[in-house]
């Protein structure tokens, strides 16, 4: 077959296939045009998942009669000069959206420029353009797309259900609305109830308001403001505290110079920043806004402009990691401690409570009377778990695995100056797992296992980066039996385990010999530790960087080397744990993202008893 020139109509349809993949693609292109036109209010309406009808109305600058005639021609644009290709500052710039859409659908445009006495309208049906005629419209532009892809029936076969396509449109509009909180958006259609996002105030508060409206009130409550800047590149935005996560990565939003984009390298930076806070199966919720010189980023990588290429991707990644880690560390204590007093009050409120119906004699058996005892006691028991390791020397003697915890019944917990410390003074332990501490203005509840797990984890990391992890040699190597596949996984990573002081070697089929363990873990159960490590290694991606693999190893070791639930602690031990928490970075959350402590203010306690 000889080479021949394709007809213009076919060329347009090929271009449409690249730019307009589905109704959501058309909505994206049209809304971006409305934003570029300076619109302060943009209304979107759809029918049939956008397949039957899409209507976009804005109050932007509009077009003159001459501009309207060119707008439906290929590669005609008002957003690009000869020398601007490397300095793209607008969302749409190729001049492809309108002609591409009109080549596969019915397109009607009505627009009015401030300099025109009235509006102008044009219709395009599968590439066939009508004459431009006068019309009625306030300043701005109204674009209506009907029967999308009717001129390319093959494309219709690949569209999903109306509900699925409508959801894709909603996600596109959500992202654009997050990028521009200064613009009011309305999304309506037969598939959904109308949603309106009012224009927000400029700055971080307005941005958080818009993000909260879209991502939910939980995000607004748990949001941490983050930011970092270097060499002309700035990263700003909000990230949810580790206590608010998702089962997938769909809650991670990235915007570059106001453009919603997807970038695997940058989102990998988000995972790295949260690695010390979240388990492997949970994902953070973030909205990050990167601003840099347009010459430093290529927005022309993808026909739909959903991907970008950075000239210095390493710098952008480093700034994102720094911004997130700094924000998480800075707000760690606040996000862990600030339990909503109103929520606690509601949880404890009893309907129908009456003062007459609650006499002192009605205390349940075992109820505690503050008049008869100066401090809350716990029953004397033998410590059944391994010793707690990692405290300072002043409290180390208290952790003797073979000795029972002392009976402190009736002993007053020493207060001294500890009441003024962030985590206060330990008063008692409840349910053999939670420490109750008193502060000057309330009380603190600490999960002893979660708190010590974070302390051990941070110490393991610090040891690795300094002089190496201290080891303890076993007098008699411990032989651990497991399936051959698990043994192979462990032996394949033996050099990595060695970095953390865990020395293993083969002991025949289906067994390994443990010769050394990290000193920080004390008398940890080596068999249980190795089995957990083998299970976690089975889930590792082979491409996972060595640093991340080592962090996973440290997290698993920390869990096994921590004070266990059910271990009775003396007051000295509890206070030692509180002081260690205050000196440990990221101690507000355990390695799995759960809070290590919560705080209840005195004002909230008084509300529980009707004193406020």
Curated annotation (Swiss-Prot):
Molecular function GO labels: ATP binding; ATP hydrolysis activity; ATP-dependent DNA damage sensor activity; mismatched DNA binding
Question: Does the record bear Cytoplasm in its keywords?
Answer: no
The GO biological-process annotations, alphabetized, read as: mismatch repair
Question: Which CDD domains does this UniProt record tie to the protein?
Answer: HATPase_MutL-MLH-PMS-like (cd16926), MutL_Trans (cd00782)
Q: According to the lineage, what is the superkingdom?
A: Bacteria
| Keywords, alphabetical | DNA damage, DNA repair
Q: Which GO terms describe its cellular component?
A: mismatch repair complex
Query: InterPro entries, per this entry?
Result: DNA_mismatch_repair_CS, DNA_mismatch_repair_MutL, DNA_mismatch_S5_2-like, HATPase_C_sf, MutL/Mlh/PMS, MutL/Mlh/Pms-like, MutL_C, MutL_C_dimsub
* PANTHER family reported in the protein's UniProt record: DNA MISMATCH REPAIR PROTEIN MLH, PMS, MUTL, DNA MISMATCH REPAIR PROTEIN MLH1
Protein role:
This protein is involved in the repair of mismatches in DNA. It is required for dam-dependent methyl-directed DNA mismatch repair. May act as a 'molecular matchmaker', a protein that promotes the formation of a stable complex between two or more DNA-binding proteins in an ATP-dependent manner without itself being part of a final effector complex.
So what family is this one in?
Belongs to the DNA mismatch repair MutL/HexB family.
Protein name stated in the entry: DNA mismatch repair protein MutL
Q: Could you tell me which species this protein originates from? A: Afipia carboxidovorans (strain ATCC 49405 / DSM 1227 / KCTC 32145 / OM5)
The beginning of the lineage is: Bacteria, Pseudomonadati, Pseudomonadota, Alphaproteobacteria, Hyphomicrobiales
Gene field: mutL
């Amino acid at each position: 077959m000889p080479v021949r020139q394709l007809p213009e109509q076919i060329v347009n349809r090929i271009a449409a296939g690249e730019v307009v993949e589905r109704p959501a693609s058309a909505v994206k292109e049209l809304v971006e045009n409305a934003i570029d036109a300076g619109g302060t209010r943009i209304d979107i309406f759809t029918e049939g998942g956008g397949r039957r009808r899409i209507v976009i109305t804005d109050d932007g600058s509009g077009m003159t009669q001459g501009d309207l005639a060119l707008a439906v021609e290929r590669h005609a644009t008002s957003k690009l000069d000869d020398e601007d290709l490397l300095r793209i500052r607008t969302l749409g710039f190729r001049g492809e959206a309108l002609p591409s859409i009109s080549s596969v659908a019915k397109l009607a445009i009505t627009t009015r420029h401030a300099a025109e006495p009235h509006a102008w309208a044009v219709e395009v049906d599968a590439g066939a353009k009508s004459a431009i005629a006068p019309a009625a419209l306030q300043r701005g532009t109204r674009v209506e797309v009907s029967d999308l892809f009717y001129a390319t029936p093959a494309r219709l076969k690949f569209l999903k259900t109306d509900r699925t396509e409508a959801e894709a449109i909603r996600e596109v509009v959500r992202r654009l609305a997050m990028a521009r909180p200064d613009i009011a958006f309305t999304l309506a259609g037969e598939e959904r109830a109308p949603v309106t996002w009012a224009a927000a105030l400029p700055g971080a508060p307005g941005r958080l308001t818009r993000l909260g409206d879209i991502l939910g009130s939980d995000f607004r409550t748990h949001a941490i403001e983050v930011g970092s800047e270097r060499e002309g590149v700035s990263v700003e935005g909000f990230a949810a505290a580790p206590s608010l996560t998702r089962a997938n990565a769909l809650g991670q939003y990235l915007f570059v110079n106001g453009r919603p984009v997807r970038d695997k390298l940058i989102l990998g930076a988000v995972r790295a920043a949260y690695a010390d806070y979240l388990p492997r199966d949970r994902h953070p919720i973030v909205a990050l806004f990167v601003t840099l010189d347009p010459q430093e980023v290529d927005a022309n990588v993808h026909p739909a402009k959903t991907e970008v290429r950075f000239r210095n991707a390493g710098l952008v990644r480093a700034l994102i990691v720094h911004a997130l880690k700094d924000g998480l560390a800075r707000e760690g204590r606040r996000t862990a401690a600030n339990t909503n007093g109103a929520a606690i009050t509601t949880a404890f409120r009893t309907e129908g409570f009456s003062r007459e119906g609650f006499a002192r004699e009605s205390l349940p058996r075992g109820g505690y009377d503050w008049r008869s005892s100066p401090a809350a006691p716990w029953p004397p028991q033998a410590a059944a778990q391994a010793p707690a390791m990692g405290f300072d020397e002043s409290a180390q003697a208290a952790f003797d695995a073979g000795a029972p915890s002392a009976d402190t019944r009736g002993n007053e917990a020493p207060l001294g100056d500890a009441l003024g410390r962030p985590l206060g003074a330990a008063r008692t332990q409840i349910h053999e797992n939670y420490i109750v501490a008193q502060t000057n203005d309330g009380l603190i509840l600490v999960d002893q296992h979660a708190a010590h797990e974070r302390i051990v984890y941070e110490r393991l990391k610090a040891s690795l980066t300094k002089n190496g992890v201290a080891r303890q040699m076993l007098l008699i190597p411990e032989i651990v039996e497991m399936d051959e596949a698990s043994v192979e996984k462990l032996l394949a990573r033996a050099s990595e385990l060695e970095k953390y002081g865990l020395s293993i070697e083969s002991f025949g089929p289906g067994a390994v010999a443990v010769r050394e363990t990290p000193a920080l873990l004390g008398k940890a159960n080596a068999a249980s530790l190795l089995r957990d490590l083998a299970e976690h290694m089975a889930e590792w991606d082979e491409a996972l960087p060595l640093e991340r693999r080592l962090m996973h190893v440290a997290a698993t070791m920390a869990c096994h080397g921590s004070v266990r639930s059910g271990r009775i602690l003396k007051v000295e031990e509890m206070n030692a744990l509180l002081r260690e928490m205050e000196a440990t970075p990221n101690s507000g959350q355990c390695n799995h993202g759960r809070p290590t402590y919560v705080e209840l203010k005195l004002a909230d306690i008084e509300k529980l008893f009707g004193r406020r």
